[in-house]
Swiss-Prot record:
Location relative to the cell: Secreted; Secreted, Cell wall; Cell membrane
Signal peptide range in chain numbering: 1-51
Residues of this chain annotated as glycosylated in UniProt: 87, 99, 125, 169, 271, 309, 326, 354, 363, 378, 393, 429
Keyword vocabulary terms for this entry: Carbohydrate metabolism, Cell membrane, Cell wall, Cell wall biogenesis/degradation, Chitin degradation, Cobalt, Glycoprotein, GPI-anchor, Hydrolase, Lipoprotein, Membrane, Metal-binding, Polysaccharide degradation, Secreted, Signal
Originating gene: CDA2
Lineage, broadest ranks: Eukaryota, Fungi, Dikarya, Basidiomycota, Agaricomycotina
Domain called NodB homology: residue spans: 158-348
Membrane-spanning ranges: none
Protein name: Chitin deacetylase 2
Coiled-coil annotated residue ranges, if any: none
Amino acid sequence: MIPSTAAAALLTLTAGVALAHPGCGGQEIGRRNVGGPMVYRRDVTDEASAAASTDVNTECTAYGYAPVTEIASSFPTIWETASILSNDTEGQQLFATINSTLNTKLPNDVPHGTPTGDWTGVNYNSSDPDCWWTHNKCTTPASDTGLEADITIVPEPMTWGLGFDDGPNCSHNALYNLLSENNQKATMFFIGSNVMDWPLQAMRAHDEGHQICVHTWSHQYMTALSNEVVFAELYYTQKAIKAVLGVTPQCWRPPYGDVDNRVRMIAQALNLTTIIWSDDTDDWAAGTDGVTEQDVTDNYQAVIDKAGNGTYTTHGPVVLNHELTNYTMSVFMTMFPKIKSAFSYIVPMCTAYNITQPYLESNVTCPNFETYISGVTNISSSTTQKDGSSSTNTSSSGSGSAAGSASATSSSDDSSSSGSASASSSSSNASSGALGMFDGLSGVGLVLSGVVAGVMLL
């Protein structure tokens, strides 16, 4: 928490460094250097071949997937701050509507600091009128804003809310194998640029029944960004996930937890529920600022110990874990047996809140809590047949729009249900307008043919 002085009406923020998880910027997970010459190429043809190896060097060797050029121009440059594209008329119109409402309802809520988390010289009212999480861990906006409270806990006792930030990670096969072997589903908070970089890994997450949420396009401090950039960071990540997986997420997690009412209002207009956390494992911080791997293990153990001391008799924790590096994934794998032993249930966030329609599309459902704990953890999707009848697929494998439709290239060229926590009349209306922005990409296989200068493996 950024320090405050109770006696001061205005607070001067002098922190010059990121106070949350500064290492969580994406480059640790095989971030590609867009624009450089390709020096590696992995021969993968589909999702299964991408999931076959647990050798990190093999997993994180770049691959190409067609048709790249057909859709690449519909998105911002990967790993650069997103902005609305000049030819994206629908995006521009949707933002104009949202921005008009925002300026009317929250005219005094303005950006804070820099996108890298530097608040030097920033003056902010110590009463926290913007419900700024980074300032005071505020998660419940004032009622007159019309904003939903952030999700921070699981309403079911002795239940661990499982999620992973920063994916998809090119080297996540070992983690996903563990989850699959234990019939364990999670909520995956995906960075848009990572989805573009590693589409087959994103497909695996969705097809194996994990809930997919938004974690912005370029992973920056959102409250430092302009209204337009906040919108673009969320909008294009939704759009990329829709293009790759065929579904439009209705949930998101702000990088570093950095959110305020202005950012919440933009997210809610895109029908995105804000999910924070109650407990941070600090897995992202190992090796920085004096944080050791033992500290991370101790943090996990502290959450586990709460299950034994009565803390979770009325609710459960939402725990911050990361699909960030091999270490952050492996430490979870090590602690998973202890978590299973200590907690009655481990569930994804859609199940925790009985949100049976986790996406804008109504043909994919998430099991509610009662169904999940009975052993039916699979995502169910329905399709309409040519004769007008419908069929239901109750396996954990969904059907993303890119799955099976895009083909690998070997060239070396350069290149909601009523239970939804996000439901509100204002966000619902805006979302109806947002639906059209995805129609043109439905059924198109999104992949990023790699231009790579090298792969950083940590």
